[in-house]
Amino acid sequence: MKRKLVIGSVVAVVLALGAARAVRSQSTQDPLDPLKIAPDTHKLALENAFVRVLDVHVPPGRTEPRHRHPHGLSVYFTDWDVRVTREGAQPEVRQRKAGTFQWSEAIVHTIENVGKTEGHVLRIELKF
């Protein structure tokens, strides 16, 4: 199972890099950058001209303050339950499953781990 997750993660990164046509500059001044908002749970794993990859670990009961992600791909490594509150929307509880992937457009949101297991996500943010 872990081997499949690692292979899937590598494939996701390769696809993201292969799709790059233009480079969008990353705003290092963004006050909603999750690396600034929640540095204890969001770690920079890789950054180049095309992508920024965040290794995210959200413990049970933890609420992540309002933050922003550009469009990109999330790779889930653990099963966990998360309450997602998108800007201007009602909160939704979602189940994340290990080994699954999810594309999302740019988002501003707050998340809360409402389950009993740590959420582990690799967030691949595209810079184009």
Regions found by a protein language model. Name each.
Residues M1-S9:
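Bacterial N-terminal signal peptides that target proteins for export
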Residues V10-L15:
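Hydrophobic helical h-region of N-terminal Sec-dependent signal peptides
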Residues A16-P31:
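Bacterial Sec-dependent signal peptides at the C-terminal "C-region" and cleavage site
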Residues G88-A106:
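Short acidic-glycine-tyrosine-enriched beta hairpin
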Residues D79, A106-F128:
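Ligand-binding loop in jelly-roll beta-barrel domains
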Residues H69-G88:
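Glycine- and acidic-residue-biased ligand/ion/polar-headgroup-sensing regions
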Residues A38-H67:
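Mature N-terminal segment immediately following signal peptide/propeptide cleavage
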Residues G61-E64, T100-E112:
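Histidine-centered metal-chelating micro-motifs
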